[in-house]
């Protein structure tokens, strides 16, 4: 895998953001791993996280004009990514939304740069796709165009039907979804460590049942 992808998996494990064991998902499945982006919770981790996202965005070649971080998790993500991109020589405006509209001051639900041109949505993962749907609606209501979505991890896992949430977003909105890492990269990480054979087998079994 690309060097930054391998580094990101190791970074997530070291930060205890990515854990292996037995975890119950919202869908009631027993997953052999858990990804909790909320534990990227200090300055150094957030700085590195933004850099990994920025590398994935540049690597993808996706064209966009504005970065949008949906409340709440997307807000620090968007800020850290545009700072990282600025360090790479690209200055990108960013915006985020409030959960509730403000009726004083600048008002409205969108804070930061105007949503115009091609807008790239950032999130940690795509589960049900609710956050993406709300973001797409908000962007289109501003007469802007959704350019795509960038996430930290693609679990490559079926939802209620035969497709993953990521596949559904790609097809429903006809936009690319860029992931810093996918389940494939997690598997490669486990394969390199002889002490993680049990975890590797658990992931393989889970993937056989729920993978896409």
Curated annotation (Swiss-Prot):
HAMAP family: PyrE (MF_01208). Orotate binds at residues 34-35, 127, 155. This is Orotate phosphoribosyltransferase. The keyword Metal-binding does not apply. The lineage of its organism: Bacteria, Pseudomonadati, Pseudomonadota, Betaproteobacteria, Nitrosomonadales. Coiled coil: none annotated. Keywords: Glycosyltransferase, Magnesium, Pyrimidine biosynthesis, Transferase. Belongs to the purine/pyrimidine phosphoribosyltransferase family. PyrE subfamily. It holds the Pfam family Pribosyltran. Catalyzes the transfer of a ribosyl phosphate group from 5-phosphoribose 1-diphosphate to orotate, leading to the formation of orotidine monophosphate (OMP). 5-phospho-alpha-D-ribose 1-diphosphate binds at residues 26, 72-73, 98-99, 102, 104, 123-131. GO terms for cellular component: cytoplasm. SUPFAM superfamilies: PRTase-like (SSF53271).
